[in-house]
From Swiss-Prot:
GO terms for biological process: CTP salvage; UMP salvage. InterPro entries: P-loop_NTPase, PRK/URK, Uridine_kinase, Uridine_kinase-like. GO terms for cellular component: cytoplasm. This is Uridine kinase. HAMAP family: Uridine_kinase. It is found in: Cytoplasm. Keywords: ATP-binding, Cytoplasm, Kinase, Nucleotide-binding, Transferase. Pathway: Pyrimidine metabolism; CTP biosynthesis via salvage pathway; CTP from cytidine: step 1/3; Pyrimidine metabolism; UMP biosynthesis via salvage pathway; UMP from uridine: step 1/1. GO terms for molecular function: ATP binding; cytidine kinase activity; uridine kinase activity. ATP binds at residues 13-20. Disulfide bonds: none annotated. It catalyses: uridine + ATP = UMP + ADP + H(+); cytidine + ATP = CMP + ADP + H(+).
Length: 213
């Protein structure tokens, strides 16, 4: 069944910039206003490439901040399917095994799909499919502190490993790919999830688009 009223919101920015917080806030508040059956979140992380054919020694070398780590074709196909009113089975990625699991998450068509990830606007096809593109513009030092706390507390990583990864891939890839993609955003949100005015503006624009469909 066609779903011409499906609106895709792409929310991007640096790792730990507050993307997930904004996506979660918008999702929760629109759930209350429209009903949770009308809105869903898909994370770009789910579309990292399957690496089950590689040995673990090769998998751990993955640069998760480079566009080549993503299965873009599958993501684009899923977005098109949702636009056309078809359900999709979103992959489940394991950072422990550095590859996809055998499980998927069944995602039914929604009026609003929030897509969240660091590399979204680096792909022209995603930009064309997104009805609203958002860049969360948070200073890199703040992002690093948040990432450091998160990875040590939630993922059991050492201080040195987080610092090494930040220097080797996170910061260089942000400067090379993510920051330049800000030019494609319709809305730039400073201060991340604490910017209440910007979140209200984003919600208002989403509701405006819904009324136009």
């Amino acid at each position: 069944m066609s779903n011409p009223s499906c609106i895709i919101i792409a929310i991007t920015g640096a790792s730990a910039s507050g993307k997930s917080s904004i996506a979660s806030t918008v999702h929760k508040e629109l759930c209350n206003e429209l009903g949770c059956q009308e809105i869903g979140i898909i994370t770009e992380d789910s579309y990292y490439k399957d690496q089950s054919h590689l040995e673990m020694t090769e998998r751990v070398k993955t640069n998760y901040d480079h566009p080549n780590s993503m299965d873009r074709d599958l993501l684009i196909q899923h977005l098109k399917n949702l636009k056309n009113g078809s359900a999709v089975d979103v992959p489940v990625y394991s950072y422990v095994e550095h590859t996809r699991t055998n499980e998927t998450t069944h995602f039914t068509p929604k009026r609003i799909v929030i897509l969240e990830g660091i590399l979204l606007l680096t792909d022209e096809r995603v930009r064309q499919l997104a009805d609203i593109s958002v860049f969360v513009d948070t200073p890199l030092d703040i992002c690093f502190i948040r990432r450091l706390q998160r990875d040590m507390e939630e993922r059991g990583r050492s201080l040195q490993s987080v610092i090494d990864q930040y220097r080797a891939t996170v910061r260089p890839m942000f400067l090379q790919f993510i920051e330049p993609s800000k030019q494609y955003a319709d809305i730039v949100i400073p201060r991340g999830g604490k910017n209440r005015i910007a979140i209200n503006m984003l919600k208002a624009q989403i509701l405006h688009l819904l009324n136009q469909k």
